[in-house]
């Protein structure tokens, strides 16, 4: 099982999380960003949040469109949101699984 790095964005109203393949790949992407590179860095084009909306730990669920728009404004594409989280967030931890509320990551997240 491969490991992933959790990137944590401390939001004004809601904290948001994305999962990247590694810090090294994120650093490379940020030096010369492109959608092609982003797809190599982030396997799931989805945004998550803790159940209570705060912090980087605990059970994660899908971030709603409203939660994401409250943090970044309306009309942002998922690629733009993930880019902003990678740029303005911080690597929080490395994990070997993506367990979220309702099963594995990839269900019902903002995408």
UniProtKB/Swiss-Prot annotation:
Any further remark recorded for this protein: Present with 2430 molecules/cell in log phase SD medium.
Source organism per UniProt: Saccharomyces cerevisiae (strain ATCC 204508 / S288c)
Keyword rRNA processing: yes
Chain spans, region Disordered: 89-111
Entry GO CC: cytoplasm; nucleus
One GO term (biological process): rRNA processing
Compositional bias annotation for Polar residues: 90-99
The protein's name in its UniProt record: Restriction of telomere capping protein 3
InterPro entries (UniProt xref): Ribosome_mat_SBDS_N_sf, SDO1/SBDS_N
Alphabetical UniProt keywords: Cytoplasm, Nucleus, Ribosome biogenesis, rRNA processing
Pfam families registered for this protein in UniProt: SBDS_N (PF01172)
Subcellular localization: Cytoplasm; Nucleus
Main location: cytoplasm
Role description: May play a role in RNA metabolism, rRNA-processing, and in a process influencing telomere capping.
Protein family according to the UniProt entry: Belongs to the SDO1-like family.
